């Protein structure tokens, strides 16, 4: 089992080995976040942050709230904070972001990590690549633009006593690693790929930033987390090799080849793999036209019964809803008797509430989908529609539903996203058809958005989907909601997809210091429920913290809440014990003061276990009215 103590565990630098690498006068303290202090000419400069307030200058490399709060401690009331120019305005007034976020979180497809600052942090000196920053005693820091782990990332370069030292934040960790993979999700404009489909979208920027840093030939790199990097060239080369292997693997079984085609995916691949790289893509599996009894209406499928009734899978917006109205007006169907929702993205669910009301029919879903449909504000997931469905009939995994000349079997099917279902459709005159939402296409698997929670575990995620597809009756077809075809994989093709997926697990495991790669791909392994709630002044409520222990061992996790003014709780600290590969929760009561200031407030939680200490990791929104 891999130890993650090098990244997160509270551990002070022990004696000479770490300090001996640094020039005299640079103090390095290792902890959950590393702290660097330089004192010269009666001035104290701190890099990243620290527990002693009153530093004259505090340099930060990017904007995540664990780092900005660490910097705030060091700056105290008088210290000058130096930060990337692109985020200076945000740091001046973060409440504007959170107020807008109350609405923006719905129908959201930019897919950026949400662990952003809550309280303002005045930036005395915004800096950008190419700038030179004066430090105490005549020291000079050069600034490099090094985006990758974050959009705004920068690196500070210092030459002292014949050594060139780089302070690069979370750009690279010792051993050629990074803290996680989901932080690299982003748009790839060069390939006309948006943020939602941008798996590893900033890995190309990471490679270029690492090459820029390598060209500077630093003697040491001091990251925000973990050990000093004493072999910069070796660790940089190792990290580039690792991310290229992961991205090549991802592209080789990519469902997007069906939609975006070779030109766009090759363009995306070469940004990471190199300008002349050969990009391997999977060719299309067998596919044929839909049967006459299944009509393709955008992302909606309409099933026709022998007596003229219709049954709908998904209804994602005005277009599909208008098509259903046309089908009724034209007599293609005489009535619609039910809607099954495969998953929670708005292009499959936004018009469900209107359709159900207009057609007077029930809505069906598996439990993991149903709660998001009924309580969308309680969740933060990609593309969640704010249009709440009043009543969803929950179908258990494996539950059968007889409708007209059809037999339906509902399945929990956590492929494209964790909150995902599927419907096996059988009728006497046709081979079984498995409507799998958006989880596969004829060219592979739909795992292009890490925020969808594509868990890489034997008991769930795509491995569960592979098992269910293999168990289908021989000759069964698959249907993707976006595709007007039946398709199916040969056993050999499914074996290849699964083999590549297993290989990627090992590659991700080597990329990050976590003891299980799922922490590196699952941003919401610890998340509040409800994510957002509205409470009036003087009201009470509750907040549940849901935690997944992805580790193969038991964990005790200590939790501490950080509450905004006007919000209190009877207990702000608690301990959760979880068995290996289990998830659990704890509930915190909330009380809103009678004189609480109205507006959107943010609650956060620290998470501490024996080998990690994560500050303000999870957040929830409370709108006080």
Describe each PLM feature range.
Residues 21-54, 156-169, 173-174, 278-329, ...:
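Conserved beta-strand hairpin/beta-sheet module of binuclear metal-dependent hydrolase folds
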Residues 26-30, 50-132, 320-322, 327-402:
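Active-site HxH/HxHxD metal-binding segment of metal-dependent hydrolases
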Residues 44, 132, 140-233, 238, ...:
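Metallo-beta-lactamase
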Residues 506-536:
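Low-complexity, acidic Ser/Thr/Pro/Gly-rich terminal tails and inter-domain linkers that flank the onset
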Residues 547-551, 592:
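Asparagine-centered strand-capping/turn motif at beta-strand->loop junctions
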Residues 550-566, 607:
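Short acidic, flexible loop segments centered on an aromatic residue
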Residues 567-594:
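Intrinsically disordered, low-complexity Pro/Gly/Ser/Thr-rich segments with frequent PxxP/GP/PP motifs
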Residues 594-625:
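Terminal connector regions
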């Amino acid at each position: 089992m891999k130890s993650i103590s090098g990244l997160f565990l509270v551990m002070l630098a022990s004696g000479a080995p770490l300090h001996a690498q640094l020039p005299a006068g640079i103090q390095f303290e290792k902890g959950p976040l590393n702290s660097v202090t330089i004192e010269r000419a009666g001035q104290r400069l701190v890099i990243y942050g620290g527990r002693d307030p009153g530093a004259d200058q505090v340099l930060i490399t990017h904007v995540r709230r664990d780092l900005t709060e660490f910097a705030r401690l060091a700056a105290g009331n008088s210290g000058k904070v130096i930060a990337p120019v692109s985020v200076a305005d945000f740091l001046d007034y973060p409440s504007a972001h959170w107020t807008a976020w109350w609405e923006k979180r719905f129908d959201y497809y930019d897919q950026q990590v949400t662990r952003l600052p809550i309280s303002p942090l005045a930036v005395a000196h915004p800096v950008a690549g190419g700038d030179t920053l004066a430090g105490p005693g005549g020291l000079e820091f050069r600034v490099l633009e090094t985006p990758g782990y974050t959009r705004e990332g920068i690196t500070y370069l210092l030459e002292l006593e014949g050594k060139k030292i780089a302070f690069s934040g979370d750009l690279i960790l010792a051993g050629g690693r990074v803290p996680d993979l989901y932080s690299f999700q982003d748009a790839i404009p060069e390939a006309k790929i948006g943020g939602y489909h941008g798996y590893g979208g900033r890995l190309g920027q990471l490679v270029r930033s690492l090459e820029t840093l390598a060209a500077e030939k630093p003697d040491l790199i001091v990251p925000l987390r973990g050990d000093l990097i004493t072999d910069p060239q070796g660790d940089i080369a190792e990290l580039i090799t690792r991310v290229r292997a992961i991205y090549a693997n991802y592209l080789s079984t990519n469902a997007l080849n069906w939609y975006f085609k070779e030109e766009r995916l090759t363009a995306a691949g070469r940004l990471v793999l190199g300008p002349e790289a050969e990009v391997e893509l999977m060719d299309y599996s067998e596919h044929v036209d839909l049967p006459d009894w299944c009509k393709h209406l955008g992302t909606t499928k309409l099933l026709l019964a022998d007596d003229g009734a219709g049954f709908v899978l998904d209804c994602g917006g005005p277009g599909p809803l208008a098509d259903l109205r046309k089908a009724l007006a034209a007599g293609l169907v005489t009535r619609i008797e039910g809607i099954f929702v495969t998953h929670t993205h708005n292009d499959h669910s936004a018009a469900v509430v209107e359709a159900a009301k207009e057609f007077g029919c029930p809505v069906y879903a598996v439990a993991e989908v149903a709660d998001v449909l009924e309580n969308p504000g309680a969740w933060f997931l990609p593309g969640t529609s704010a249009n709440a469905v009043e009543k969803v009939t929950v179908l258990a995994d494996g539950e059968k539903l007889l409708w007209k000349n059809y037999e339906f079997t509902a399945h929990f099917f956590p492929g494209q996203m964790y909150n995902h279902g599927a419907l096996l459709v059988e009728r006497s005159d046709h081979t079984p058809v498995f409507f799998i939402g958006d989880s596969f296409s004829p060219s592979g698997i739909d795992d292009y958005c890490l925020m969808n929670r594509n868990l890489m575990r034997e008991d769930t995620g795509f491995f569960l989907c592979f098992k269910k597809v293999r168990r289908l009756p021989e000759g069964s077809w698959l249907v993707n909601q976006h595709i007007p075809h039946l398709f199916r994989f040969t056993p050999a093709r499914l074996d290849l997809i699964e083999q590549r997926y297993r290989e990627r697990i090992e590659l991700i495991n080597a990329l990050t210091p976590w003891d299980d790669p799922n922490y590196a791909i699952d941003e919401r392994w610890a998340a509040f429920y409800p994510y957002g709630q509205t409470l009036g002044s003087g009201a009470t409520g509750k907040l549940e913290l849901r935690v997944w222990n992805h580790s193969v061992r038991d964990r005790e996790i200590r939790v501490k809440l950080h509450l905004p003014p006007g919000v209190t709780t009877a207990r702000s600290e608690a301990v959760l014990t979880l068995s290996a590969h289990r998830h659990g929760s704890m509930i915190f009561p909330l009380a809103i003061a009678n004189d609480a200031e109205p507006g959107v407030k943010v609650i956060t939680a620290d998470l501490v276990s024996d080998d990690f200490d994560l500050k303000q990791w999870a957040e929830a929104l409370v709108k006080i009215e």
